[in-house]
Amino acid sequence: MSKKNERKKIISLVKERASFLFSTNEISITKAAKKACKELDVEFDDNMRRTISRHLKINGITNNVSEADIEETDVFKEAKNKEIDKSKKRFIFSWCQSETEIHDGFLTNIEEYAKHIDASIHIIAGRYKNPTSIQSNKNTKAKEKNLTNSWHPRVVPYLDANRHKIHENLCLLSDVKIQPTASTPLSGLNGMTGLESCIVGHPRVHLKSLPILDGYPHKLLLSTGSVSVENYTDTKSGKKGEFHHTLGFVIVEIDGDDFHIRQVQCEDDGSFYDLKYFVSDGEIMLHSGVEAIVFGDLHLGETNEDVMNTSFELSNYLKCNDIILHDVFNGHSISHHERNQPFQLLKREQDKTDSLFTELTEMLQFFDTNSEYNFVMVRSNHDEFLDRWLNDVDWRKANNKTEYLRLANLLIEDKDGKGIIPKFLSVTKNDNVICLGIDESYRIKEWECGMHGHIGSNGSRGGVIQFKNLNTKNITGHTHTPCREDGHCSVGTLTHLRVGYNKGASSWMNSNFVIYPNGKGHHVHIINNKFTTL
């Protein structure tokens, strides 16, 4: 053996002996180092003391393991080399903070669910930069902690700090460390993965659909949720992080050239719903039905019939009869946007889409055809097209004169002020429809579902920041773009993804939102007329 290798072996023995002495005799690092050197007949100096001190930190024997030391552990090095099982078609991704307890029941349920659906589990290795983290500040003796690595032992087999290409159009960015207190974990990631959607590890559950050019694959950014419990400082940023901390995971199903992706959250006891399944105490069951589904904006006349039919298939699959609707009426026959466009008006005249009677009849037929469902129709901006038309135009010079006079008489009788569409539906006796007014609340479990999204605070234009800052969780429509940011979610659309006026790059997606009996919920995207492989 060379002198160099012999020296390494001796130093390794000194480090192990010093670790044992420090852990069992409650002596200082310096005393443990001196004693180990004396026993093994090795010269003690300050370099040796620092070497042993670093060894104790890296192996979690001393408190306040630094971020750099954590990343030198064998556990993290293995996580950096983690590989994806290419034979799997389903994956579950979550996140875990170092030096932090996990929710045992939740992880057990994830493991059992993964076995049931044949999924591979990956848990992204999270690190909290703040050294005053409550967990590491506990007055616990080093020997009592007796840590051999910096993550909970149960997550170590799944720990991931590598970057993976899950699918031709989907990446997992386990190598991107985002502070758990970051309020917008998806910011700055838009161009990082090119054409590919990407998943990042973070205890907040956020979702963004990015604008793409026509013909390109949809691009989503998602964060995972956590399997570790809250562990934050008592600072403002720490308390905000604690409030938004969510136990959850992302599930991915590979479906040939496509993939399906959902963000699942659990209850306090670790139980969770995912589509038709309810998982609790390690058991996988078929549940009796979901609470409600919020459909993407409908816009009859521009609706993609295949997507709408698939959405009703989703309702039947989830045993759901209660459906929230946005922008049922489109208003293309009387749109103020086209009032001064003579050639567009001529085109509508030629293809018979300028008939208000036909458009109203299609709406009635929609509710009659789907009479087995209970609908709640949220007051939307396209509903207001018709009220605006009645107020603005001179009926003597306009098309649709007969419908104008008929609806004008109804509007005069509108005592509750909800507008002409609700009044029209009440007269035609559609008993399976509840029509909301513009400021009328409609709550389902924890969610406010009575806002369309076109009006924000104090009459301003609605937006994500306004809605996520409201004092209640809420689901809106209007943007045709699925989004999730803290307590705010918006649905996509059930229309064709190109309808003429959304020129340029578009973030529109065919996407609905499911609300489960426990009050949790997530988006279900319709991809090529499918929503799952389960």
Question: Where do the model's predicted regions map?
Answer:
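Extended recognition/assembly regions associated with phosphoester-bond processing machinery
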Residues: 3-4, 8-9, 31, 35, ...
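Short, amphipathic alpha-helical "recognition" segments used to contact nucleic acids or chromatin
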Residues: 6-27
